[in-house]
Each structure stands twice: as C-alpha cells, then as structure tokens.
A protein has these predicted regions:
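Compositionally biased amphipathic helical and low-complexity segments enriched in hydrophobic
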Residues: 16-19, 60, 88, 259-260
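Compositionally biased, low-structure terminal segments
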Residues: 5, 20, 31-34, 38, ...
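Domain-level detector of nuclease and nuclease-like folds
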Residues: 99-279
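N-terminal, intrinsically disordered, polar/charged segments of Gram-positive cell-envelope systems
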Residues: 24-96
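Sec-dependent N-terminal signal peptides of Gram-positive bacterial secreted proteins and lipoproteins
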Residues: 1-28
Length: 279
C-alpha cells in the first residue's frame, strides 16, 4: 500500500511537470515521462514479486516439514522386540516450541502427499476431553501408501507362546494419539504397521510406549507435556521408515526422544508403494 502511494505521488508530480512545459519540449517530456513511468512500475512490481516469493517460501518451509532418513537404523527382533529405540533426551526447547498449552499443529502434506511433523502441548484438560471415546475420522484420511495395500494378517502373540492373533497389517497410526488430544485427520496419521502403532499388542511397544508414558504422567501430575512426532522417509518413499517422538514435561521429569520402527516381524515392506510381502 505504501509503495502504491509512492507510485501515485511520483505520477502526479511527473504529470504536473509535463503540462507546465512549453509545447516543443512537451513531446520530449511526454516520452521521457512514459519511459520513466513504465520503468517505475516495473521496479515496484519486481520488488513486490520478490517480497511475495520470499514470504511464500518462508511459509512453505514452516508448514511442510517431512524429514528424510539421515542415518539408516536397522531393526531386529532381538535388540528391539517392542519396536522402539531410545535416543536419549529430547530436543525440545520450550522457548522455541510453535504451540501453546492445549494447542496442536500439523504440517501440510508435502508434494508427494506425505504427512509431516506434528506438535502439541498435552494438558490434563485435553486428556480428560479425549477419555472414553474416539474422534470420528474426518474426510479423506488415508495417509500416503495406505489405500489398496491393507489387509488382515496373522501376527505372533506376545501373551501366549506359539499362538497368533489376526489384525490389519497397517493402521492409520496417529502421530499425536487421540488419547492425548490429537485429531483424526490425514495430517496427523501415517501408514504404520500394527507393530509400529501398538507394538506386540501388550501396551508397551510401538507408539504406545511413549503415548502411555505421557498419558499416565499427565493424569497423575496434571503437568503439561510438550510433544513432537516426526515421520522419517527415505528419498521419495511414501511410507515412513520410522517415527521420531520427542516428549518433555514442563517440570523436566519426562525428557525423552524415541525412534519407533515402522516394520513387522516376518514381513518385508516396499516403502515406495506401501505393498508388503510375507517372508
């Protein structure tokens, strides 16, 4: 708006000069005016375009936050029977966290339709609001790699040796669990194996490990927990290899970073398409 005002003032002044000059010089002045006016418009237009592109790029960087694998971490049933690995203390800085207490933020889907990072500050109020019911799915909620690839399979039971239980191979796995106030929308779910979501069905594996830890702590203490869940992809694959979760309570009693593997014993996953095969 300021640039437009400047442009208008310049035009008025130049017109005044033009009409106050003698006729012979007016023709020359007119062409000078025309050229200068056109150049001025171009200059301001170019400046405005540069500013627009800068803001657009800044917003893109802020809102689309899919992460690629930096260092391959291999899963095996002996070392990681519950499908998660501790990475030490969290990376969370309270002063730099993008949301406030009781708020949630989900990245926009990237150009491949992949889910990005989710942030939330889990409060006792949000936990109580979510207790005893599940939020209905809203709109198109199938994450990248999910559609057409899911079917029921048999998994080894963690409760009875030699026994199996039947379940869907893939879940629409929440980045921020609905029990923690997370929304049932596409930007908050990834295509995750049953094991990535709940481990071996024993409430201490997969995403449930850190989710239950945070849930129980908030219920017990009433303290807020800062929570960040980040799906990690390799190159242009559309199913994440794993999810990295950072959780830190406001009193520092919970301060943890975990890697949750997106795989399943006895199966091979094509992360480029979401198809899977029994070994």
């Amino acid at each position: 708006m300021k640039d437009f005002k400047k442009l208008s003032i310049v035009s008025i002044v130049m017109l005044a000069v033009l009409f106050s000059t003698p006729k012979v010089e007016a023709r020359m002045t007119f062409w000078d005016f025309k050229n200068k006016f056109v150049q001025t418009v171009k200059d301001y237009s170019g400046k405005a375009k540069d500013e627009y592109n800068k803001v657009k790029e800044d917003l893109k960087q802020e809102e689309t936050t899919t992460t690629e694998v930096q260092e391959e971490t291999e899963w095996n049933i002996v070392d990681y029977p519950d499908y998660w690995k501790s990475l030490g203390k969290s990376d969370i800085d309270f002063n730099q966290f993008p949301v406030n207490a009781g708020e949630y933020k989900y990245a926009k889907l990237d150009e491949l339709g992949r889910t990005g990072t989710a942030y939330g500050v889990i409060t006792l109020e949000k936990v109580r609001e979510s207790a005893g019911w599940r939020q209905s799915w809203k709109g198109d909620v199938d994450p990248s790699g999910f559609k057409g690839n899911n079917k029921k399979v048999k998994f080894k039971s963690s409760k009875t040796k030699g026994k199996f239980y039947e379940a869907d191979f893939y879940n629409r796995s929440h980045l921020i669990a609905d029990s923690l106030g997370g929304d049932s929308i596409k930007r908050n779910v990834v295509t995750g194996t049953r094991m990535q979501n709940v481990g071996k069905n024993n409430k201490k594996g997969g995403m449930q490990y850190i989710e239950m830890k945070v849930l129980n702590y908030v219920k017990r203490t009433g303290k807020n927990v800062y929570y960040k869940a980040e799906p990690v992809y390799k190159n242009n694959e559309i199913v994440p290899r794993y999810v990295i979760v950072n959780a830190k309570s406001e009193d520092g009693k919970i301060d943890e970073k975990v890697l949750v593997f997106n795989t399943a014993e006895g199966y091979t996953i094509d992360y480029k398409t979401g198809k899977f095969y029994k070994n």
